Amino acid sequence: MFPYKYLTELPQVALLSKQVGGAATATLPNTLMSAFTRLDVKSLQLDAIYPLEHNGGGMFAIGNRALIVSKRGKFFLYDSDDAANVRDLDISVNINYQEFLSFVNSKGLDDKIVQNWFRFIDVLYHEDSSGKSLLLSHYYWHAQDECFTVRISRLNVPEDGELENVSATTDDWNTVYDTKPCLKIKPKGFYFAGHFSGGRMEFLKEDELLFTVGFLGFDGNASDYFYSQGTDGDYGKILKLDLQTGQATDFTIGQRNPQGLTIDSKGRIWSTEHGPQGGDELNLIEQGANYGWPYVTYGTDYGTTRWPLSESQGRHDGYRLPIFSWVPSIGVSNLIEIQGFLPEWEGDLLVTSMKQQTLFRMRYREGRVVFVEPIKIDLRIRDIDQLDNGNIILWTDKTWIIELTPGENFITPDIADFVRELEEPEKQQAINAIHSCHVCHSAAPGGVIETAPSLWGVFDRKIAGSRFRHYSPALRSKQGHWNEETLNLWLEDSNGFAKGTSMAYPGIANPAIRKAVIDYLKALQ
């Protein structure tokens, strides 16, 4: 009936809030709107309860619970059935963070780079024939050799033990794999480009793990050398690890910073990857494929309009093409395939982003993406997973845990009900007038988009009284509410009603058509 192009939010009434130190935590909206679908929200901000740093860590769903590791390696267990009480787990891991800080300070380097990017990346909980274990990806500083790697560590969980009761010290972890070679700090560009980590893990089968590794700033542009196209290093690739032998082989090459990885119900492997300034990618991963970095990209070097290593700018010629690319970049992070959430969403991919602070629902059919629906969250989304109850759970850079559930959908009134008493051509003119409203305005509950406020609930609402941020001064200066009288004046002559309004239009001269539009607006409740 009308275009839904943007996510919308209801007023900010939180489902969850905690008293911490005598003050309530911040809250998030308790409802979001996607296209024709209301999403209910449960949310909790961990750093209002525990002292945590922002921008890092990962999450893994276990039944209706989620295991979370923070940027600095603190573990938490979130339970969908008891969402207000997150368990702090007694698990410690050493990555030699303080030693790396001391090293860069001794060299007179800016240690904020280490503080920001030397962190924990991803976590998996795994059960197989050999037992239960936690797998963790993170940076590790090799103090004796003065170099760093991306490491996978493993913690065996007692067979009869519950995860919330596990206690582990740094000595209880085993090293599964360290990326090769161990990297010295760079003399060019960022000395430690830790924001290009990759680090995502996904089981291919019981003893085989896929592991994404970012290029760590070694791209032949901000460095004199790169590893992503050679055989002498792991960086800029997706590796296949044999967990029995600890050996790694290149599964794919030519990646830049693959921060998302999932295997869908058909066995297809999907990865999301950061491009440079533009060119974030959704890739369908096939063993042995070369995805082209750093020779090709749909992005450019930062602050320029070109990527210096590309012979053909912006073409991605000669290498495996992405299934989809975002230009400009969205700051892509992880992704999942949606199963058992909503019938309308079944089998779609849900891609998260940091820069755009948005979920992207993507439908892949017959070899192509047929649509992409943005769902604005307004927080940097670091990770995503789906619980056994079907709910979608997000981990954000500001330590919010957000759980999304399908809500009861609103019903849009049938336009035909409001034009029955009109004769042609007035009937069609009234239908056209109502449709023209929805060229700019949403009719979703609480809908707030960039172009115009939602019409839902407009009747009896204060004039210029919604959460829309871009009302004209002319409309903001008006007193009163939208009722039959004020709506009639507005529809007849908007500029006469609010001189200087940014929404001046010719108006509707026919009072019968104006009445049909007003009756329709009254029904949007």
Regions found by a protein language model. Give the residues of each.
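C-terminal capping alpha-helices of c-type cytochrome domains
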Residues: 390-392, 406-410, 481-525
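Acidic, Gly/Ser/Thr-rich repeat motifs that build Ca2+-stabilized beta-propeller blades
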Residues: 6-215, 268, 328-367, 387-404
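Beta-propeller domain segments
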Residues: 15-39, 86, 110-113, 118-120, ...
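Hydrophobic membrane-insertion alpha-helices, especially the h-region
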Residues: 1-3
